[in-house]
Amino acid sequence: MRFLPALAVVFTVTLATAACAADDANRVTVFTASSLTDVVDDLAERWETAGGPEVVAVLGGSNHLAAQLRDGAPADAFLTADAELLNGLLSNPAPADLVRGFAYNHLVVAMPSDGPGRNPGDLHNRDLVLVACAQGVPCGDATWARFGDLPVDSYEPSARAVVTRLDLGEADLGIVYATDVAARPGLVQAWPHDPACPCVAYAAAALTDRGRSFLAFLDTPAARDVLTGHGFVTEPPS
């Protein structure tokens, strides 16, 4: 299992496309939404244990990754937090080329675990620093749909970037995915949140035969166990 930042793709396209076929056959490149960072390593481990080739995960915001794919960046599969980004990536896709809703996530308001108690009214407290995702990326669109207009102090390009601001002590509150909080002992939900929609439905596209095999793996009990173990839901929310 290897990770690459999304920006690295820009500089490695030529080298990747020139790599020998035998080398390519020993790995599967998966463009992966940054909100799946914590789970993709375990998914790759299960996949590789079952005999699949090494996974090279290219991590980044869903919109940014989709743009790179449209510009010709080589990949075998694309895991996105925005199913709409799959439109136009494939021409006449077969059913096995697309998986919509292999996992679901929802938003929570997070804060550093050593912070004082908060309540929903604090979202409009101008004395607190509130960080959220920018509109136009999946977490930002979901934030707007759920919470409406908020006095946000800093808009970030991804939920991971919001988490980083919280980790660094640069924000009092941040709107992130429930799985982000579950993965970090230093963060807690600012107040109890019941799972609520609008939810984020993760989707996947296969761009090669190896990618198609990886998508089939996502629909196995082993993959679902990994996803639920990281706090994702694998059935559509009611």
Give a label for each model feature.
Residues 54-63:
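A short beta-strand-loop structural module common to alpha/beta enzyme folds
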Residues 20-50, 63, 67, 82-83, ...:
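Exported/periplasmic ABC-transporter solute-binding proteins
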Residues 97-103:
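A short alpha-helix-loop-beta-strand transition element characteristic
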Residues 57, 99, 189-190:
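Conserved beta-strand scaffold positions in the cores of enzyme catalytic domains, especially
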